[in-house]
């Protein structure tokens, strides 16, 4: 079951009521005896939530309040993120409002790139992966995934349809230069999700990102990342069966979309509000920009960031 909730207002009370409604609709009740909770937002860069790129801290604050009101006030709560090629979590926490949130709610901020690690092996489509992953992800009692509702980037020579629940857990990989996984991006996303199982997913679609940012006012909640992503894909105008990493996740039995039920808002009404992106135009635009950057580097003697040098046209 996946819930779809929508707010007409955008202040803290409106957002909190919408998050609560989404969680109650799926009857989410954390066990009272849990001691440690990890919350993983999407803080992929230093753009704040108004751009549609990163998780709104007010959504995370509402989740924390809900957990406390459900009788888990004694649980240790940590908000976690890892470094990326062009982002350091400690700076993102400060710039995106999470330092203030941590102080207000008395929770801890953790950079997964500084965490103790463990090695995990997994196979997807006969491709064997060995990941070095944060130990705390496996030691917590409750893992809450709080991704963004947004279209995906152009990575590793391919245009990723969407970035949501499954892709956000890819961000748990602690090494900053994740570009090395882009050659097998779909397989890597699924592999990570075979190893890391979140207990709850709350998608921040308050300001969503399609062709441009839009004040969609939507919260999607569920306990199955594949099911949540399937509904998120439909909101964005995609057929989930045509999205490679969702199709692969289904094959690898990472979650289930059989007998999927949506409660709350009318899915079609939300779909009509989302600014769909033309993937062909996006790919052409990105390829042209990259070609111009390479031309500039050739004549100026300047260098491209390593993350761009590894892309292929």
Predicted segments with their positions:
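N-terminal and secondary-structure boundary signal
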Residues: 1-313
